[in-house]
Amino acid sequence: KAESRGLGDVYKRQSHGAYKFSRKPDGDILAMDVIEKIHKKIPKTHLVMHGSSSVPQYLQDLINNNGGEMSQTYGVPVEEIERGIKSGVRKINIDTDCRMAITGHYRKIAREKPAEFDPRKFAIPASEEMEKLCADRFERFGTAGHAKKILVKSLDQMAQSYSKGELKQI
């Protein structure tokens, strides 16, 4: 059976949100070799990378160029996340990147069109940026095109499957 484990120990200094690292992370900060060692010992264990937003520079710039005051910060490089995926990581949290995409575009509209008050005029470009970001991550993380493999079940059906031990590793 596959199990899921969080990897708080992989970050030698774990942090969440936008302010993860004050410099581009390397082996002194990210212990990706730990993920690889875990995967070799227990290859059917699914791993989780909490707080793995990449905190893209272009989104920091979008926010700051439109009135924001984000201090320079660095996230988990997408290349390192891809490396983790090759070693059993199956869940990656990128919420901060999504929030940065939304915030950057809200700020841009507010700066460029200060008379604008219709939230749809803010939400549409913000949502488009987040969609672009997520599509990139789906491609890079190898998940694009797999939706048809997902069997849709109701919450009650899932609860019954769990209680009967019917769920199988795919």
Short names for language-model regions:
Residues K1-L7, Y11:
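Single conserved hydrophobic/aromatic residue that forms the stacking wall/gate
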Residues R5, P43-H46, R90:
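Short, well-ordered coil/turn segments that N-cap beta-strands
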Residues G8, H50, G84:
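Conserved, mostly hydrophobic/aromatic
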Residues D9-P25, Y58-L59:
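Active-site-proximal beta-alpha loop/turn segments in soluble metabolic enzymes
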Residues R13-G17, H50-P56, G75, D95-D97:
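Active-site beta-loop-alpha junctions enriched in small/polar residues
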Residues K24-D33, S54-Y58, I81, A101:
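Active-site-adjacent beta->alpha loops and helix N-cap segments on the catalytic face
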Residues G27-M49, L62-I63:
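Alpha-helix-loop-beta-strand connector modules within alpha/beta enzyme cores
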Residues N65-G67, V76-I170:
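C-terminal alpha-helical cap/extension of soluble enzyme domains
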